Structures are given as C-alpha cells and as structure tokens.
UniProtKB/Swiss-Prot annotation:
Family per similarity comment: Belongs to the phosphatidylethanolamine-binding protein family. Mitochondrion-specific ribosomal protein mL38 subfamily.
Recorded superkingdom: Eukaryota
Protein name (Swiss-Prot/TrEMBL): Large ribosomal subunit protein mL38
Recorded name of the encoding gene: MRPL35
Subunit structure: Component of the mitochondrial large ribosomal subunit (mt-LSU). Mature yeast 74S mitochondrial ribosomes consist of a small (37S) and a large (54S) subunit. The 37S small subunit contains a 15S ribosomal RNA (15S mt-rRNA) and 34 different proteins. The 54S large subunit contains a 21S rRNA (21S mt-rRNA) and 46 different proteins.
Stretches that traverse the bilayer: none
Claim: Nucleotide-binding is one of the keywords in the record: no
UniProt source species: Saccharomyces cerevisiae (strain ATCC 204508 / S288c) (Baker's yeast)
Length: 367
C-alpha cells in the first residue's frame, strides 16, 4: 500500500513576529475579523473543548464529533497561509501601481478564513461596513465574483430578452451592480428583481438606487448620472413608439459603502428631470422602464470633481434620445436595471396625484 508523505518542515517552523499579519489588528480594518466572539473562539481554540456555535440545537452540538486531527491540520494550514500573506503585503507596500497593489492585497486576504466567513454568512447587498467593507479590495473581489455568478447573468438575460438592449442603448458591459426599490410608496422594503412586473401604486413615488462599484475608481472625484427611460410610449403620428425620460439625476457622488441614491440625501441641483411615475394607458400593452447608470467623464488633472452642466430646458422628456444624450456628455454606461408595468385600476389616482391628464384608451380600431 502506497502512502503519500507531505514534507512539512518549512510549515512547522516557528513563525516570526511579522507572519502574524492576520491576527494583528493595530492597522488592519475590523472587517477582516469575525465579529462574533463565540465563532472566533471556536475557530481558533487550541483544544477541542467548545461546541460549534453554528449548530443551533444543543443535543446536536453534544453529538458533534470533528474529524480526527482537523484542529492540527487547520492550524498548520493557517500558519502557512498567514506567512504567505505577509509576503504579499510586503510586495504590496513596495508597489506604486494601484491596480497591481489591489491584486496583491486580494491575494494576501483571499484565503483568510475570517474574511471568507464574513462574506459567506452575511448580507452582501445590505452590507454592514464592520463586517463586509467594500473599501477593502478582497471584499470587492468576492462581491464581484458573487454578482457575476448569478445577478449579472440574470440582468443581461432580462435586458436582452425584453429588448431593452438595443431599444434604448446598443449594448452594455456591466461593471457595477445596480439595485432598485420603492420603499416610500407602499413601505415594502424589497429590492426589485430585473424584469419584474410592478403595479402603478408601488412605483408612485421616487425609488432608491444602490450602485455597487467593484472596480478601482477615484471615489473622491468620480460622479455618476442615473436615467430612467420608457421606450414604449405610443407615437400615433409615426405609427411607432418613442422614448420618454421618467427620471434624471446627474453629478451624484458615491463611495464603495455609501452608495445609496436616496431622495432624502441628494440636492435639487442633482435633478435634471423630476420623477414621473409609470402611468401606462389602457390597452397600450406592457411597458418597460429601464434604469441606466453612467460614469461621468473624469479629468484627473482637475482639482475637484467634473460636474456636468445640463440645460434642463433643452431636454425633451416626451421624446428623449438617450443615445444622443450619452454621446453629447461622453457618458460611460456601467450598469442597468429594468422593470415592467401595465395599466391597472390605480393609474387614474396616480395621474391625479401628479396633475397629469387622463390617459387615452386604445382599441383595435383607431378612432
């Protein structure tokens, strides 16, 4: 019977002081540590004297028996990875290129069990900065992987299946995760799935956006533009449809963690087109409402942020050309979202609330 022997001389060497990089929190963010003392004590206990806190029932905790020598193997692996992490930190401190430095910092923390625990067992969307801090490169890396594994694919499938691409913009290379909810209308604190049908009552008040950047950006200077457009407004004179601008925001500043675009936070100067809720007309069919998020052009040599100056009087909300708008102001699309709506019994009340005229009623035969 053949046995595989593993040479562990280097691993079992007594580590020096600099190798304890993961356990020294004098300069490290607290988000790189497990916040639960019970979980942390169990993870790093020297003897298997504690019951696993992840098992809720006491009877099951008592029955639990860990694999033989698992604690010794874990400690050996932890010491090895921690020593290797310190080398990546040394390289990162010598590197001036921001992208290369981020890559080294990710390698230094990607195998940290505390980081993996924090990300896997906590809310990634409504993140708490003390647990999942997107200012830290490794959390942005893990967040991007998680988003690309499902959320990004779902978004692109809905945008292409519902023909929001190319009916609004020709294409999208998604770089940031965009989420939207309407908490002020019905009080339902729910993030909307792309392509979901929403009643006119739900969308009757302004939404909240969450824009999660995963790439390295200059958060002090980078500004954003957010547009909501409806490409399904009936255009009877041309026997076609036209695009309406439902909401427009510019010069929005975001950070990796403070990234909620909330009407209670931004100024009126950020609004180029105030919110007009979806009010589909009867028998007009299903209408798509597409959210586009753009990075505004960034001038690195400029001291402050590059503010867009847009003449609101020149905007044609009823016949909005989003392609011309993005080209004129050199905007880069980084994310999108979409929901759908159709006529329902609440539309008349929403129209009255916003001072809009009664909607038309379409029939099979034009009158």
């Amino acid at each position: 019977m053949l046995r595989r022997s593993i040479h562990t001389t280097k691993i079992l060497q007594k580590p020096n002081a600099t190798s304890h990089i993961w356990s020294d929190f004098t300069t490290r963010p607290s988000s790189l540590s497990i916040q639960s003392s019970k979980v942390k004590n169990y993870l790093f206990q020297k003897k298997a004297s504690l019951d696993p806190p992840s098992i809720s029932r006491r009877s099951n905790r008592i029955k639990y028996s860990p694999p033989e020598h698992i604690d010794e193997i874990f400690r050996m692996s932890y010491d090895f990875l921690e020593q290797r992490s310190s080398k990546f930190y040394e390289l990162a401190n010598k590197t001036k290129n921001p992208l290369k430095k981020d890559a080294l910092l990710i390698k230094a923390e990607i195998n940290n069990p505390e980081v993996q625990y924090n990300f896997q067992f906590n809310n990634k969307l409504n993140n708490v900065k003390d647990i999942i801090d997107y200012d830290v490169p490794v959390y942005r890396h893990l967040g991007k992987q998680h988003w690309e594994s499902y959320g990004q694919m779902l978004l692109m499938q809905r945008l292409e299946t519902l023909a929001a691409i190319p009916d609004t913009l020709p294409t999208l290379v998604p770089r940031a995760e965009v989420n939207i909810k309407f908490p002020f209308s019905t009080g339902v604190n729910k993030w909307i799935e792309p392509g979901e049908f929403l009643s006119s009552n739900v969308t009757s008040m302004r939404p909240i956006f969450k824009i999660q950047e995963y790439e390295l950006v200059n958060v002090e200077k980078q500004l954003y533009t957010v547009l909501i457009v409806n490409p399904d407004v009936p255009d009877l004179s041309n026997d076609s449809f036209k695009t309406a601008l439902c909401y427009g925001l510019v010069n929005i500043n975001l950070t990796y963690n403070d990234n909620l675009i909330d009407p209670r936070k931004f100024h009126s100067s950020n609004i180029i087109a105030d919110y007009l809720p979806p009010v589909p007309e009867k028998n007009a069919g299903k209408q798509r409402f597409v959210v586009w998020v753009f990075r505004q052009p960034l001038i690195e040599d400029k001291q402050g942020p590059n503010m867009l100056e847009i003449d609101r009087k020149e905007l044609s909300r009823d016949d909005f050309d989003i392609r011309q708008f993005t080209k004129k102001y050199n905007l880069t699309a980084i994310g999108a979202h979409i929901w759908r709506s159709e006529w329902d019994a609440k539309v008349a009340a929403v129209r009255e609330k916003y001072g809009l005229p009664p909607g038309r009623v379409f029939s099979r035969v034009r009158r």
